[in-house]
Structures are given as structure tokens and as C-alpha cells.
Swiss-Prot record:
Region (Disordered): 1-155, 174-328, 427-464, 491-525
Domain dDENN: 865-960
Gene designation: Dennd2a
Source organism per UniProt: Mus musculus
Name of the molecule in the record: DENN domain-containing protein 2A
Regions of compositional bias (Basic and acidic residues) in chain numbering: 56-70, 79-117, 140-155, 221-237, 427-436
cDENN domain boundaries: 730-863
Length: 1000
């Protein structure tokens, strides 16, 4: 009898698996379920089993030896069945029988131990046998065990299934089955079960509605088959039932379940595959059960499930069968509802399966519910952040309130759908980077269509700061910005006050400017405009210094290095500077460069020792650093960086100057090179030339980049020198202290205004270092602009005739040359005495060049420079700078940068995009609300300084941003929408204005 049973098992269940014989599958289902459940049913089941003398290995060997399916089942090999289930097939390789369905393979292998074999043998004897089919012997012996009522009910159901098998075989022979198209959800079912035809469903329903028998069978499976705790421990390390070949029980689920074996059944499948272990995992997690579901309408949860439980396995175990999620949507609800209530399993499974088959895009409904345009509109983004971790509240959480309305589409969704959409929202938020204060910053999310709460203003595009990650602006910059805003008022207000006195008690014209233009102001403005335009015609069109460096990118860091010493040509005569060393010895350049270089080499000694006649041998001398600038015939500029020091030896001796000539204007970089030169010169003069050779062979550094120079130093080995080029073209480490100690704030601002209008300025000082530092500091103040004209920080007395040039210049003279200067016929020039802080000669309008409000704000910041330079919390002037403190150079630099931001910071808005970028000049000027500022721009825009600045921005293809660009961007972000950089009514009608300007 057992042989016959094994034969039937192999022919119906295994070999006919690829075919679309539903009856064969259903007939084999009780055998597989019993084989799966008995080994784990507990000690009581094992105690009832009695040992059998028959060896199961022989039966299995005989069963696996079959090569072809029995001839008694011709219907199972028809072509109709092969077309009906193309994804199911049978493979025989040696002793291995494999069945593949949708990427899942259930392999039948040899049993490896005798205990498992005996258990399977005992279980086989307990199973009731169906009626014989096609001459198969009847299995009626049960080895001394009486049939229980549940077994009788099980057998009666099995008989009804066999009748359906015969009906299906008959239909297959007639060719009326197996050719129907599959519904979308069928191919994703776990065990590749075919769908029931419409004519089969009523008959199956009649068999399932057996009344007492069906209810008793459900009660038996729900109550009796509950594994003990020791068996549940054995299940923890087992593989998923979808992957392995052995019939392990499904993994215990969590709430929500991590996708164990399916719990719904196809119509007519019966209640024979209720998966064991439905309720014991619930007790381990101590989680509240999911709500029960009413049968016919789509499942509606009575209360939302807790969102704190994610559907993923957080214990680190892999989720089983992640590739077959599409047909599992309704398993969770059905399985969880079975724990709390005895529902009609057939009605629930039919309902879930019908919904699965009726929706073509079930998975899209889960991930992308169409009820929300913005997935963040229900997410609370503020008030929930702790440190750098954000605690987000979702609509389904117990703390959130959901209106109890049946019209909401979100409530019509099942709990699984809502949980998946919430989990997707959480995943989207997790992928966003958190800002420094811990708040999420979804940069590219679309704003809500109808903002109705203060939270929705996070997506308001009018405020540019809200939609992006907040930048940390230094406190010093914030304080400087506040001073400017307090002085000039708001952008749309043209007057600070209509009264004669302001809030501070000062006269109105001190802090604000009246719009009434007097004849004197108009006349002065017209005269300045004429002078600037006339100088623009006379002066050569110099390009900006940054553009000069473009063709120099592939050259060396410097052009040549020289040493200048003082010598006497004859006794009793004055000392004369002479060139004593030169590197490289030969200038391998073009003829034009060599001719120009020779002229410069002749002039360099005069710049290194402009005070040569005043020198005498000294015993001690502190080294000093200064620089000069050589301007070529074509306007090209070369910088000379000098270090004057006393050579080694004893007794009185004369100093010498080490000079580096380069086209790169970076004082800090070459100052570091000169430090290394001085260190090696103290050891031996022979060590200087190898160092300069290494520096010349180094690549030319790009903006903001660092190059490394290696050089051998006796006693220390190979030293590594890092040379960094600043990101901005302005001079770094400028000594503003010398400038402020020599000039008052009012005089300094007047000189600054004269340089902006490209006037001629001469500095007078008695020390070479003071003269050089003040000239460099003044040039650094006009950043981001570059001084385009003649610039000689220290002018030798032999070249004093240059001050008679009609072109703009900034020249420094030693006080010893002042008598010669008075004898020369000077034109309009500003002569500044740095020794006594006074103007020796001026044009009388220097104080009225700049816009009044901005000038007052600038002077106010410069007056409080020491307070701003100290710690922001306050402290003495000699306080130790902390992490929040700023140096004097930072305060001064930020003050003048903010001044230019107020004037021209809106230029990016008027740069046309395209291959040839150009500035819309008239629109740029008229966009300013202040009339005085517009008048200043009218003159300033005609200078070569402004033209070079705009040409550099027009030609710049890369987005390299210096300090000015960063501050200008921050300034534009603070403006309300529709008012960029002082843009008032003009930008609102920019289109009409541009048409008018085009016609003009």
C-alpha cells in the first residue's frame, strides 16, 4: 500500500507539476502540508507515531528511478498544459528532481539521516488516501490507528478535489482549457498556481460550503497546530521556505509580517494550507494586533497601525523572497486578522485574490499613491529635531490627528498601502542631507500647491534662504551688514527721514541725502564725468591683471631672481646700486621680451635702493620686506618682491636686496619664498640658487591651489615648502595698521574715492617700509577691482619726472624727494603726506564723490574697527583673539567689500547669458533706487577699473567665486522677491524698459 501511495505521489504531485493540472496540484497539497507540519508538530505527535519495519530509502530510490511520467496520465503531457504554465517545468538530473516557478526552485534531495526518514515514513502512514485513480491500488490501511473526525473531513474534501481533477482533464482533452490569458497578478503567485475558470468556481464553492465540516477543519488548524516554544527556537536558523529544498515551516512573522508563505488561497483550493505559526510570534514581540477586517468591501482598518514598526526586518535577517512582492499585498491583512477573529477564510481569500487580479498596477499603487502631490505636506519639519536626528511625525502615527471623514481617499486605502507610502516618505527624507542645525533640507521638492500652514512657507520660493541649506555667515559680517542697513535704510525708501533731524539727533544731510539737486552738485558731477571720459580716451586700454595671467598660466612662478648690492664707483662718491647676481643667467625668451627685460633689469637696482645716497655701512640691521611694480609699454605689470637684509660677517657692512620679479601679484606667497631665501643666506650664499631653481621648476599654481617645493638643506635634510596661491587676486597679509596709523578715517576714505575715479595720487613718507605698505594697502582696498594704471609704490628720485604724466597713477615718494616734487608742473593730483596726516594738494571735492549714506556707514565701521576686531562679546583692545574674533585686516576688508556689494553687487542679474556674455549697462545703473548712487555709477562705470572688472566677469567661464562673489550672493538672498540688489520699480517692468533701451 505504501508503494502505491508513493507512486501516486510522484506521478500526481511531482512529475505533473509543470502542467496546468490544478487537480493534481490540489491533490498533492495535503501530502506536502502534512510532510511539512509533522516534524515540527511537537513531542506529542512523535509519541503517537509507531516505528515501521519498512525502510523509506528503498521506496525513495524506487520513486526517483522513474524516468518518464506514467502512461496512465496522458492528459498531463498535452500541449495545452505546457502553454498554460510556461514558467513551471520539470528537470531530472541524476537523483535530483527540481521544480522551478518564477525564480523559486524547490529541490527534492535525498534525506540525509535516518531519523528524518523514519519521521516521514510515520507521517506517510498517518495520511488518509484518496480513491484509486486509473487502476491505482486503494490505500486503506492505517497501521492500527483509527481515523479521527478531522481526517474524515479531510478525506471528503480530497474526494471532491479529485472529481474536479477529472472534470479538468476532460476539459483539457476537448481543448477548452489552458488557453485563456493569464490575469496580471497570477504570474506573481508564490507557487505558480493557475487561475480557476468561471465554470469551476461555483462547484468549488459548493464543496467548500460544507458547513460544520469546513468550520471544524478551520478550528482544528487554528487551535491544535500551534508549535511549542522549543520548536520555535529551532526555526530561527532555518532558511526561507521559498529558497530551500526542505519543507521548513515559514519564518515567524513580526507585526507587520516580513512576508512568510502566502496565507490566501485560490478559489477552490480549500483550507488545507493554513500556514502554521500564525500567532506565536505575536506573543514574542508583544505588539498590538492589527485590526480585524469586514469581509466584502475592500479592507478598511479600524485604526491605523503603528508606524514605529517598519516592514523590514530590523534584526538583520534578510527579507525572504523580495522579488515576489507583487502578489503578497493582501497576505498581511488576512493573516493578521485570523489571529483575533474566526473569519470566513474562503470569502477573505476570494476577495483578496479578486482584488489582486483586477488591478493591473498593484505595485504602483503601493509606492506612488495618487492622493498626494507632495509627499512632505503631512510631515512636520520643525520642532521635532533633536541634535542631528530628526523625529518625523507621519499621518498614521498615534500622535497625529486624522479627520474621521469617509470622503478622504487616504482612509479608503488599506493599512498596508498607507504603511508603504509612509515608509517611502521616510526613506525619501532619510536620503536628504541634514543641515547643521539638524533640520531636513529637501532642496528639489516641489512646494505645496496650496500652502495653508506656517510649515508650508518652508517651500516659499520668494525667500531664497528658505529653500536651500542655510549658510553660516560670520558674526563680523552680520554686524557690518547691520551697520550699512541702519545707515542707508530700506531699499525702496529714497529718504531716511523727511524731518530736519534723524533719530540720532544729527542733521538730516549728515546721514541721509536730499534728492534736491543743487547747481553746485550738478556742475561737479558733470565736471567729473567729463574728466573721466577724457582720461579714458587718453589712457591705453589696459586689460585686467587677472586676464594678463591667463597666458601666463603655463609659465614659471617667476621670471628672474636678482641680488642687488651697493658699491662706490670712486672714493668720496655716493653709493650706487648694482646687480651682482642673476638667475637664470640667460633669458631664453623672445626678442621683445629680452629687450623689455633688459630695460627692466637696468631699472630694478634703482627700485631696490631708491635711497642709496642715504646709506652708510652699519653693524646691525633688521631685515625688511617691500615691493614695487613695473608697468610695461603695453600695460603689462610685473611685481618686484624685495627682502633687504644685512649679509653675514663682522664689523660694519652694507645691506643687500634679494628681489624676485614675477607677473603674479601675491605678496604672501613670495614673502614665504623670501623667508626661505633669508634662512639659507644665513647658512651659505651658495644655497640660495638651488632653492630658486626648485621654485622655478615648480608648476604655476592655480587660484586657491597649493604647490609643493622640495629642497635640500644641510643639517635638516630635504625640506618641503608649501606655496599657496589665494583664491582671490587681492593681496594677502596687507598691513592695514600702517595705513590707519598714518591716515585718519576721513582722509583715507577721500583717497579711496579718488582712486575709484582714477585720479592721480602721490604718497609721501620718510620710511621705505611705510611707503610700500601704505601703497599696497590702498590698492588692496579697491578689491574686487584692480588698479589698471601706473603703480609705483617706491619711485626712485631719478624717475621723478613720471609724476608729470597725464595718465592716472599711484606713486610713492620718499620725503627726501619732496623738494624736487614742488618744482615740477603738476596737474590735478592728490598729494598725501603720510608723516603728518594731511593733504598737500587736492581737488576739494574728494569728500563728495561717494554716495553719502554709504560713505557714512563705511566711516562708522572704520572708526570702530578695533572693537569689531576683538572678540564679538566685547573686551579690551589688546584682547587675545578667540575663535570668534577677527583680525584688523578682516574687518577692513569686509567693510570695503560690503561697500562694493551695495554699489555693484547686483551685476549678475544683468549679465546676458549665451556664448558672448555682456552687461546691460543702462539697466544695471537704473536698477538702483538711490539717486546719488545712480549718479556715482554714471561716472564710475566710465572708468577703466570698472570696465576691466566687467570684462573679466564676461570672459569667465568657470564658477570660481571669490570673497566678493560670495558676499554678493548672500546679499541678493536677503532681498525680498522682486527687489534684487536695490531693484525697485524698474525691475518690475524690466521687459518694457529693455524694449525701450533697444530702440534707443
Amino acid at each position: 500500500m505504501l508503494e502505491a501511495r508513493v507512486d501516486m505521489l510522484s506521478s500526481n504531485m511531482i512529475i505533473s507539476g509543470p502542467a496546468a493540472d490544478l487537480g493534481a496540484k490540489e491533490a498533492s497539497r495535503p501530502w506536502k502540508k502534512q510532510l511539512n507540519s509533522v516534524p515540527n508538530s511537537g513531542p506529542s505527535a512523535r509519541a503517537r507515531a509507531q516505528p515501521q519495519p519498512l525502510s523509506i530509502k528503498d521506496k525513495i530510490s524506487k520513486w526517483e528511478g522513474k524516468k518518464e511520467p506514467p502512461a496512465s496520465d496522458p492528459a498531463r503531457q498535452t500541449d495545452g498544459q505546457e502553454d498554460h504554465l510556461p514558467s513551471c517545468k520539470v528537470e531530472r538530473r541524476g537523483s535530483e528532481l527540481t521544480r522551478t516557478k518564477n525564480g523559486m526552485r524547490l529541490e527534492t534531495e535525498r534525506l540525509q539521516n535516518d531519523s528524518r526518514a523514519r519521521t516521514v515514513c510515520q507521517d506517510t502512514e498517518q495520511l488518509p488516501g484518496p480513491r484509486p485513480i486509473d487502476g491505482q491500488p486503494e490505500l486503506s490501511q492505517h497501521r492500527g490507528r483509527e481515523l479521527k473526525p478531522s481526517d474524515l473531513r479531510f478525506q471528503s474534501d480530497h474526494l471532491s478535489v479529485l472529481r474536479q481533477v477529472k472534470r479538468l482533464e476532460k476539459a483539457l482533452k476537448d481543448g477548452s482549457a489552458g488557453l485563456d490569458p493569464q490575469m496580471p497578478g497570477t504570474c506573481y503567485s508564490p507557487h505558480c498556481l493557475p487561475d480557476k475558470t468561471e465554470e469551476d468556481l461555483p462547484s468549488l464553492e459548493s464543496h467548500e460550503k460544507g458547513g460544520v465540516l469546513a468550520a471544524g477543519r478551520r478550528a482544528h488548524h487554528l487551535e491544535v497546530r500551534e508549535p511549542g516554544p522549543e520548536i520555535s527556537e529551532d526555526w530561527k536558523g532555518q532558511e526561507s521556505v521559498y529558497r530551500g529544498s526542505r519543507w521548513y515551516p515559514p519564518k515567524p512573522f513580526i507585526n507587520p509580517v516580513p512576508k512568510p508563505r502566502r496565507t490566501f488561497k485560490h478559489a477552490g483550493e480549500g483550507d488545507k494550507d493554513v500556514s502554521p505559526g500564525i500567532s506565536f510570534k505575536k506573543e514574542k514581540r508583544n505588539l498590538p494586533p492589527l485590526p480585524s477586517l469586514p469581509p466584502p468591501p475592500p479592507p478598511l482598518p479600524s485604526s491605523p497601525p503603528p508606524t514605529s514598526v517598519n516592514r523590514r526586518l530590523w534584526t538583520g535577517r534578510q527579507r525572504p523572497s523580495a522579488d515576489h512582492r507583487k502578489s503578497y499585498e493582501f497576505e498581511d491583512l488576512l493573516q493578521s486578522s485570523s489571529e483575533n477573529s474566526r473569519v470566513d477564510w474562503y470569502a477573505q481569500t476570494k476577495l483578496g485574490l479578486t482584488r489582486t487580479l483586477s488591478e493591473e498596477n498593484v505595485y504602483e499603487d503601493i509606492l506612488d499613491p495618487p492622493m498626494k502631490e507632495n509627499p512632505y505636506e503631512d510631515v512636520e519639519l520643525h520642532g521635532r529635531c533633536l541634535g542631528k536626528k530628526c523625529v518625523l511625525t507621519f499621518p498614521a502615527s498615534p500622535t497625529s490627528s486624522i479627520p474621521d471623514t469617509s470622503t478622504k481617499q487616504s482612509l479608503s486605502k488599506s493599512a498596508f498601502f498607507r504603511q508603504n507610502s509612509e515608509r517611502r516618505n521616510l526613506k525619501l527624507l532619510d536620503t536628504r542631507k541634514l543641515s547643521r542645525d539638524g533640520a531636513g533640507s529637501p532642496l528639489r521638492t516641489s512646494p505645496p500647491s496650496t500652502p495653508s500652514s506656517p510649515d508650508d512657507t518652508f517651500f516659499n520660493l520668494g525667500d531664497l534662504q528658505n529653500g536651500r541649506k542655510k549658510k553660516k555667515i560670520p558674526r563680523l559680517v552680520l554686524r557690518i551688514n547691520a551697520i550699512y542697513e541702519a545707515r542707508r535704510g530700506k531699499k525702496r525708501v529714497k529718504r531716511l527721514s523727511q524731518s530736519t533731524e534723524s533719530n540720532s539727533g544729527k542733521v538730516t544731510d549728515e546721514n541721509s541725502e536730499s534728492d534736491s539737486d543743487t547747481e553746485e552738485k550738478l556742475k561737479a558731477h558733470s565736471q567729473r564725468l567729463v574728466n573721466v571720459k577724457s582720461r579714458l580716451k587718453q589712457a591705453p586700454r589696459y586689460s585686467s591683471l587677472d586676464r594678463d595671467l591667463i597666458e601666463y598660466q603655463e609659465r614659471q612662478l617667476f621670471e628672474y631672481f636678482v641680488v642687488v648690492s651697493l658699491h662706490k664707483k670712486q672714493a668720496g662718491a655716493a653709493y650706487v646700486p648694482e646687480l651682482t647676481q642673476q638667475f637664470p643667467l640667460k633669458l631664453e625668451k623672445s626678442f621683445k621680451f629680452m629687450r623689455e627685460a633688459e630695460d627692466q633689469l637696468k631699472a630694478i637696482p634703482q627700485f631696490c635702493f631708491p635711497d642709496a645716497k642715504d646709506w652708510a655701512p652699519v653693524q646691525e640691521f633688521t631685515s625688511e620686506t617691500f615691493s614695487f611694480v613695473l608697468t610695461g609699454e603695453d600695460g603689462s605689470r610685473r611685481f618686484g618682491y624685495c627682502r633687504r637684509l644685512l649679509p653675514g660677517g663682522k664689523g660694519k657692512r652694507l645691506p643687500e636686496v634679494y628681489c624676485i620679479v614675477s607677473r603674479l601679484g601675491c605678496f604672501s606667497l613670495f614673502s614665504k619664498i623670501l623667508d626661505e631665501v633669508e634662512k639659507r643666506r644665513g647658512i651659505s650664499p651658495a644655497l640660495v640658487q638651488p632653492l630658486m631653481r626648485s621654485v622655478m621648476e615648480a608648476p604655476f599654481p592655480a587660484l586657491g591651489k597649493t604647490i609643493i617645493v622640495k629642497n635640500f638643506l644641510p643639517g635638516s635634510g630635504t625640506e618641503v615648502i608649501e606655496l599657496c596661491r589665494p583664491l582671490d587676486s587681492r593681496l594677502e597679509h596687507v598691513d592695514f595698521e600702517s595705513l590707519f596709523s598714518s591716515l585718519s578715517v576721513r582722509h583715507l576714505v577721500s583717497v579711496f574715492a579718488s582712486l575709484l575715479l582714477e585720479r592721480r595720487v602721490i604718497f609721501i613718507a620718510d620710511k621705505l617700509s611705510t611707503l610700500s605698505k601704505c601703497c599696497h594697502a590702498m590698492v588692496a582696498l579697491i578689491y574686487p577691482f584692480s588698479w589698471q594704471h601706473t603703480y609705483i609704490p617706491v619711485l626712485p628720485p631719478a624717475m621723478i619726472d613720471i609724476v608729470c604724466s597725464p595718465t592716472p597713477f599711484l606713486i610713492g615718494l620718499l620725503s627726501s624727494s619732496l623738494p624736487l616734487l614742488r618744482e615740477l608742473p603738476l596737474e590735478e593730483v592728490l598729494v598725501v603726506d603720510l608723516i603728518n596726516d594731511r593733504f598737500l594738494r587736492q581737488m576739494e571735492d574728494e569728500d563728495s564723490i561717494l554716495p553719502r549714506k554709504l560713505q557714512v556707514a563705511l566711516e562708522h565701521i572704520l572708526e570702530q574697527r578695533n572693537d569689531l576686531a576683538c572678540d564679538q562679546d566685547g573686551g579690551p583692545l589688546d584682547c587675545v583673539h578667540g575663535p570668534e574674533s577677527s583680525s584688523l585686516s578682516e574687518v577692513v576688508s569686509e567693510a570695503f567689500v560690503r561697500f562694493f556689494v551695495e554699489i555693484v553687487g547686483h551685476y549678475p542679474l544683468f549679465l546676458t547669458s549665451g556664448e558672448e556674455r555682456s552687461l546691460q549697462r543702462e539697466a544695471f545703473r537704473k536698477a538702483v533706487s538711490s539717486k546719488s548712487l545712480r549718479r556715482f555709477l554714471e561716472v564710475f562705470m566710465e572708468t577703466q577699473t570698472f570696465r576691466g572688472f566687467i570684462q573679466e566677469r564676461e570672459l569667465r567661464r568657470q564658477d570660481a567665486k571669490g570673497l566678493f562673489e560670495v558676499r554678493a550672493q548672500e546679499y541678493l538672498e536677503t532681498l525680498p522677491s522682486g527687489e534684487h540688489s536695490g531693484v525697485n520699480k524698474f525691475l518690475k517692468g524690466l521687459g518694457n524698459k529693455m524694449k525701450f533701451l533697444h530702440k534707443k
